[in-house]
Amino acid sequence: QVVANDFWLLFSCSVGAFLMRGAGCTWNDILDRKIDGAVERTRSRPIPSGQVTLTQAIVWMMVQIALAGLILLSYNFNSIILGLSSLFLVVIYPFAKRFTWWPQVFLGLAFNWGILLLFVAHTGSLNWPIIALYFAGIFWTLFYDTIYAYQDSQDDLIIGVKSTAILFGAHAKKWLLSFILFCFVLMAVSVFVRSEEHTSELQ
């Protein structure tokens, strides 16, 4: 049965995800301001182009985090802890391209955290179907962000930034096919396991 709390969770998680994505992107732009200034596609971004000062960017990031935090405090204890723990992934992601060829994995871990958070906010705990769905989201992120990274691969090579696009090179197609395959398999597993659980609950 759908209740008012379900609508609140759907609405608030959507707003919270929007705010935290904005905060994460701002944090990424703050740390990458010198890199962005050296890349053709990104040198016109607000910070490297001088449209926004570093102080303004930091204040804007903190405002977004504060608003998302207020939403998080309306949830149960487990989801508050889960939400706070996501900050580690948000903080570390911009550094990932500096020490690993797989920064897209860190992006996937961070971007799809909301799947876990919404479920825990609704039920109070995790289960295997939702964990499978979370990993499906990670593979989906690996798929699309690897494609996205190819447009900067030449500049990234020059300045020493790592990515799966550079790592895969001419072998990208088989990797991308693998990612999308794993994504669909994990989504199917999630649906199947949950349907089996639901059937057993009705018996």
PLM feature spans:
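Conserved small/polar residues in nucleotide/adenosyl-binding loops
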Residues: 197-203
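Intramembrane alpha-helical segments
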Residues: 15, 23, 42-132
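Functional transmembrane core segments of multi-pass inner-membrane proteins
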Residues: 2-9, 80-86, 90, 104-159, ...
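Multi-pass membrane catalytic core of lipid/isoprenoid biosynthesis enzymes
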Residues: 7-17, 33-83, 158-196
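Alpha-helical transmembrane segments and their lipid-water interface positions
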Residues: 24-28, 36, 40, 144, ...
